[in-house]
Amino acid sequence: MFRKTLAAAALSLVFSANVQAAPLSFQSKTLEAKSCAGKDRDGKPLCHQLTVGYPITGDKHLDNWVKKQMGGKLPTQKSVQTALIGDKDVKETNKENQQHRKAGEYPCALDYIDTLELEGYTPNYAVFGKEDWEYTCGAHGYGVHTLTVLKRGIANPKPLKLDDILLPGQKAKLTHLIKEAYVKYLVESREGDEKSAREYIVEYNGNDFSATENWRFDKNGLTFLYQSYEIGAYVLGRPEFTIPVKDLQGIVKPEILKESEHYKGAE
């Protein structure tokens, strides 16, 4: 009995020490480039734009991971400008714009966003969000927001997947919780009823609705983010569902749920 009590106390002290882990910095570097060619419909310079950004966390292992995501070399103002000017779609659009102007049609300006940021952290994990968005002269822009959870304090950290945080055989239960959250989301956002919401989910997803790998910590539990068009029409945006800790008991590993209590997000 004494040994068990001593072991429990030791584990408590270890976790308490981890809770005091050094805070991460939310500092980031944003680089913006423009490439202008001709005039827009108001007679102003028509400029294509590219925005690139990356975080500076102050943790050598995490910052090294960030560097790898940037192709092994952090971008500079010059490299971003060069990339935009040399982009084949920019060159092709400039040619098409010349034809549009001759035909009395509106020219188009391309817009790209490629950013990585630290969204938050816990004593043992860091959450990164990557925004990859573009407007290429269609009805609207389109992009994806990818979440990555990494273990802190180790070299070459690997993304934490659902299988890494779930207890054995619990994925179906997690999927059910997320689906129920989606039903509520549809009822509130579309001003419909539960029956029509469930019918919509089946019509759009068939029997393929599943828990997404795109997750992060939240002070109240775990948050799951779906991309535009992934589980519903574009008008629904990017549905995001936070499942409370109490509902995840017996589904997600206790040590993961414990981390959520100490989650700190970017302000």
At which residue positions do the language-model features occur?
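Compositionally biased intrinsically disordered regions enriched in Thr/Gly
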Residues: 21-267
